[in-house]
Amino acid sequence: MNIILLGPPGAGKGTQASRLIGKYAIPQISTGDMLRAALKEGTPLGLEAKKYMDQGALVPDSVVIGLVKERIQKPDCSKGYMLDGFPRNVSQAEALDMMLGELKQRIDGVVCIEVPNKELLGRLTGRRTCRSCGAGFHVMFDPPKTDGKCDKCGGELYQRDDDNEATVSSRLKVYEDQTKPLIDYYEKQGKLRRIDGVGSMDAIFGRITAILG
Protein backbone atom coordinates (compact mmCIF):
# COMPACT_ATOMS: atom_id res chain seq x y z
CA MET A 1 0.00 0.00 0.00
CA ASN A 2 1.48 3.32 -1.11
CA ILE A 3 -0.11 6.27 0.67
CA ILE A 4 0.33 10.01 1.08
CA LEU A 5 -0.57 11.71 4.36
CA LEU A 6 -1.83 15.30 4.26
CA GLY A 7 -3.00 17.54 7.07
CA PRO A 8 -2.57 21.08 8.42
CA PRO A 9 -0.30 21.99 11.34
CA GLY A 10 -1.96 20.80 14.55
CA ALA A 11 -3.98 18.01 12.89
CA GLY A 12 -2.11 15.26 14.74
CA LYS A 13 -0.47 13.99 11.57
CA GLY A 14 2.71 12.85 13.34
CA THR A 15 0.82 10.72 15.86
CA GLN A 16 -1.31 9.07 13.18
CA ALA A 17 1.72 8.51 10.94
CA SER A 18 3.61 6.59 13.63
CA ARG A 19 0.57 4.39 14.31
CA LEU A 20 -0.10 3.74 10.62
CA ILE A 21 3.45 2.61 9.86
CA GLY A 22 3.20 0.23 12.81
CA LYS A 23 -0.12 -1.24 11.70
CA TYR A 24 0.74 -1.65 8.03
CA ALA A 25 4.47 -2.43 8.49
CA ILE A 26 5.50 0.20 5.95
CA PRO A 27 8.18 2.90 6.31
CA GLN A 28 7.40 6.60 6.67
CA ILE A 29 9.31 8.52 4.04
CA SER A 30 9.97 12.20 4.67
CA THR A 31 11.95 14.41 2.31
CA GLY A 32 13.87 15.91 5.24
CA ASP A 33 15.08 12.49 6.39
CA MET A 34 15.99 11.51 2.83
CA LEU A 35 18.01 14.67 2.28
CA ARG A 36 19.89 14.21 5.56
CA ALA A 37 20.67 10.57 4.72
CA ALA A 38 21.83 11.43 1.18
CA LEU A 39 24.09 14.19 2.52
CA LYS A 40 25.55 11.88 5.17
CA GLU A 41 26.19 9.10 2.64
CA GLY A 42 27.57 11.55 0.06
CA THR A 43 25.46 10.09 -2.77
CA PRO A 44 25.47 11.88 -6.16
CA LEU A 45 21.98 13.25 -5.46
CA GLY A 46 23.05 14.22 -1.95
CA LEU A 47 26.00 16.19 -3.32
CA GLU A 48 23.71 17.81 -5.89
CA ALA A 49 21.28 18.83 -3.14
CA LYS A 50 24.16 20.17 -1.01
CA LYS A 51 25.11 22.67 -3.74
CA TYR A 52 21.68 24.29 -3.47
CA MET A 53 21.46 24.06 0.31
CA ASP A 54 24.88 25.70 0.74
CA GLN A 55 23.57 28.67 -1.25
CA GLY A 56 20.42 28.82 0.87
CA ALA A 57 18.33 27.85 -2.16
CA LEU A 58 15.49 25.33 -2.37
CA VAL A 59 16.47 21.89 -3.61
CA PRO A 60 14.88 21.46 -7.09
CA ASP A 61 11.96 19.06 -7.52
CA SER A 62 14.02 16.94 -9.94
CA VAL A 63 16.56 16.19 -7.18
CA VAL A 64 13.86 15.47 -4.58
CA ILE A 65 12.03 13.15 -7.01
CA GLY A 66 15.35 11.38 -7.62
CA LEU A 67 15.78 10.88 -3.87
CA VAL A 68 12.23 9.53 -3.54
CA LYS A 69 12.86 7.16 -6.46
CA GLU A 70 16.01 5.78 -4.82
CA ARG A 71 14.31 5.42 -1.44
CA ILE A 72 11.16 3.59 -2.57
CA GLN A 73 13.23 0.95 -4.36
CA LYS A 74 14.86 -0.17 -1.10
CA PRO A 75 13.78 -3.58 0.33
CA ASP A 76 11.80 -2.12 3.25
CA CYS A 77 9.38 -0.52 0.75
CA SER A 78 8.42 -3.86 -0.83
CA LYS A 79 5.02 -3.84 0.98
CA GLY A 80 4.49 -0.13 0.40
CA TYR A 81 5.34 3.18 2.03
CA MET A 82 3.87 6.38 3.37
CA LEU A 83 5.02 9.72 1.95
CA ASP A 84 4.98 12.55 4.49
CA GLY A 85 5.63 16.17 3.49
CA PHE A 86 5.79 15.33 -0.20
CA PRO A 87 4.37 16.22 -2.65
CA ARG A 88 3.65 19.80 -1.55
CA ASN A 89 2.17 21.10 -4.81
CA VAL A 90 0.61 19.91 -8.06
CA SER A 91 3.83 20.07 -10.11
CA GLN A 92 5.52 17.76 -7.58
CA ALA A 93 2.49 15.44 -7.64
CA GLU A 94 2.62 15.24 -11.44
CA ALA A 95 6.37 14.51 -11.37
CA LEU A 96 5.77 11.86 -8.70
CA ASP A 97 3.06 10.16 -10.80
CA MET A 98 5.35 10.12 -13.83
CA MET A 99 8.24 8.63 -11.85
CA LEU A 100 6.00 5.99 -10.23
CA GLY A 101 4.66 5.09 -13.68
CA GLU A 102 8.22 4.33 -14.80
CA LEU A 103 8.54 1.93 -11.85
CA LYS A 104 5.09 0.38 -12.55
CA GLN A 105 3.88 1.76 -9.20
CA ARG A 106 1.13 4.15 -8.17
CA ILE A 107 -0.25 5.97 -5.16
CA ASP A 108 -3.14 3.90 -3.73
CA GLY A 109 -4.65 6.49 -1.43
CA VAL A 110 -4.20 10.05 -0.16
CA VAL A 111 -5.31 10.50 3.45
CA CYS A 112 -6.25 14.10 4.23
CA ILE A 113 -6.89 14.84 7.92
CA GLU A 114 -9.31 17.77 8.12
CA VAL A 115 -9.77 19.94 11.22
CA PRO A 116 -11.69 23.26 11.39
CA ASN A 117 -9.41 26.31 11.70
CA LYS A 118 -10.98 27.34 15.02
CA GLU A 119 -10.04 23.96 16.52
CA LEU A 120 -6.52 24.15 15.05
CA LEU A 121 -6.02 27.63 16.52
CA GLY A 122 -6.99 26.31 19.95
CA ARG A 123 -4.60 23.38 19.65
CA LEU A 124 -1.64 25.40 18.37
CA THR A 125 -1.98 28.60 20.42
CA GLY A 126 -2.54 26.66 23.65
CA ARG A 127 1.02 25.38 23.87
CA ARG A 128 3.14 26.71 26.75
CA THR A 129 6.85 26.19 27.40
CA CYS A 130 8.88 26.52 30.60
CA ARG A 131 11.53 29.25 30.39
CA SER A 132 13.78 27.35 32.80
CA CYS A 133 13.68 23.66 31.84
CA GLY A 134 11.90 23.71 28.47
CA ALA A 135 9.07 21.38 29.58
CA GLY A 136 5.95 21.59 27.43
CA PHE A 137 2.31 22.00 28.51
CA HIS A 138 -1.01 22.79 26.87
CA VAL A 139 -3.74 24.95 28.39
CA MET A 140 -6.47 22.60 27.08
CA PHE A 141 -4.95 19.12 26.88
CA ASP A 142 -2.10 19.10 29.42
CA PRO A 143 -2.49 22.11 31.75
CA PRO A 144 -0.01 22.78 34.57
CA LYS A 145 -1.26 22.28 38.14
CA THR A 146 -0.68 25.98 38.83
CA ASP A 147 -1.55 28.41 36.06
CA GLY A 148 1.60 29.87 34.47
CA LYS A 149 4.01 27.70 36.51
CA CYS A 150 5.96 24.62 35.47
CA ASP A 151 5.02 21.42 37.35
CA LYS A 152 8.59 20.15 37.12
CA CYS A 153 10.73 23.09 38.24
CA GLY A 154 8.34 25.93 39.11
CA GLY A 155 9.66 28.04 36.25
CA GLU A 156 7.59 30.58 34.34
CA LEU A 157 5.54 29.26 31.41
CA TYR A 158 5.37 31.34 28.24
CA GLN A 159 3.90 31.19 24.74
CA ARG A 160 6.55 30.97 22.02
CA ASP A 161 6.37 33.56 19.23
CA ASP A 162 5.56 30.90 16.65
CA ASP A 163 2.58 29.76 18.76
CA ASN A 164 0.79 33.13 18.86
CA GLU A 165 -2.49 33.54 16.99
CA ALA A 166 -1.17 35.76 14.18
CA THR A 167 1.72 33.40 13.36
CA VAL A 168 -0.46 30.30 13.58
CA SER A 169 -3.14 31.88 11.36
CA SER A 170 -0.46 32.73 8.81
CA ARG A 171 0.87 29.14 8.83
CA LEU A 172 -2.63 27.76 8.32
CA LYS A 173 -3.26 30.15 5.42
CA VAL A 174 0.00 29.08 3.73
CA TYR A 175 -0.97 25.42 4.15
CA GLU A 176 -4.44 26.05 2.72
CA ASP A 177 -3.13 28.01 -0.28
CA GLN A 178 -0.46 25.40 -1.07
CA THR A 179 -2.52 22.29 -0.42
CA LYS A 180 -5.96 23.13 -1.87
CA PRO A 181 -4.83 22.57 -5.51
CA LEU A 182 -3.10 19.34 -4.42
CA ILE A 183 -6.29 18.10 -2.75
CA ASP A 184 -8.25 18.91 -5.93
CA TYR A 185 -5.65 17.04 -8.01
CA TYR A 186 -6.01 13.81 -6.02
CA GLU A 187 -9.78 14.19 -5.70
CA LYS A 188 -10.05 14.21 -9.50
CA GLN A 189 -8.02 10.98 -9.54
CA GLY A 190 -10.45 9.43 -7.05
CA LYS A 191 -7.65 8.82 -4.54
CA LEU A 192 -8.47 11.40 -1.86
CA ARG A 193 -9.77 10.08 1.47
CA ARG A 194 -11.06 12.88 3.72
CA ILE A 195 -10.79 12.12 7.44
CA ASP A 196 -12.55 14.02 10.23
CA GLY A 197 -9.63 15.00 12.47
CA VAL A 198 -11.73 16.04 15.49
CA GLY A 199 -11.95 13.60 18.39
CA SER A 200 -9.61 11.28 20.26
CA MET A 201 -6.46 9.98 18.58
CA ASP A 202 -7.94 6.45 18.76
CA ALA A 203 -11.15 7.57 17.05
CA ILE A 204 -9.25 9.33 14.26
CA PHE A 205 -6.97 6.31 13.79
CA GLY A 206 -10.06 4.11 13.54
CA ARG A 207 -11.50 6.33 10.81
CA ILE A 208 -8.28 6.17 8.80
CA THR A 209 -7.89 2.38 9.05
CA ALA A 210 -11.58 1.86 8.20
CA ILE A 211 -11.01 3.70 4.93
CA LEU A 212 -7.63 2.14 4.11
CA GLY A 213 -8.70 -1.38 5.05
Curated annotation (Swiss-Prot):
AMP binds at T31, R36, A57, L58, V59, G85, F86, P87, R88, Q92, R160, R171. GO terms for biological process: AMP salvage. It comes from the Bacteria. GO terms for molecular function: adenylate kinase activity; ATP binding; zinc ion binding. Its EC number is 2.7.4.3. It holds the Pfam family ADK. Residues 30-59 are annotated as: NMP. It is found in: Cytoplasm. It catalyses: AMP + ATP = 2 ADP. ATP binds at G10, A11, G12, K13, G14, T15, R127, G199. InterPro entries: Adenyl_kin_sub, Adenylat/UMP-CMP_kin, Adenylat_kinase_CS, Adenylate_kinase_lid-dom, P-loop_NTPase. GO terms for cellular component: cytoplasm. The keyword Cell cycle does not apply. Zn(2+) binds at C130, C133, C150, C153. Pathway: Purine metabolism; AMP biosynthesis via salvage pathway; AMP from ADP: step 1/1. Belongs to the adenylate kinase family. Catalyzes the reversible transfer of the terminal phosphate group between ATP and AMP. Plays an important role in cellular energy homeostasis and in adenine nucleotide metabolism. NCBIfam families: adk (TIGR01351), PRK00279.1-2 (NF001380), PRK00279.1-3 (NF001381), PRK14527.1 (NF011100). Consists of three domains, a large central CORE domain and two small peripheral domains, NMPbind and LID, which undergo movements during catalysis. The LID domain closes over the site of phosphoryl transfer upon ATP binding. Assembling and dissambling the active center during each catalytic cycle provides an effective means to prevent ATP hydrolysis. Some bacteria have evolved a zinc-coordinating structure that stabilizes the LID domain. This is Adenylate kinase. It comes from Syntrophobacter fumaroxidans (strain DSM 10017 / MPOB). The gene is adk.
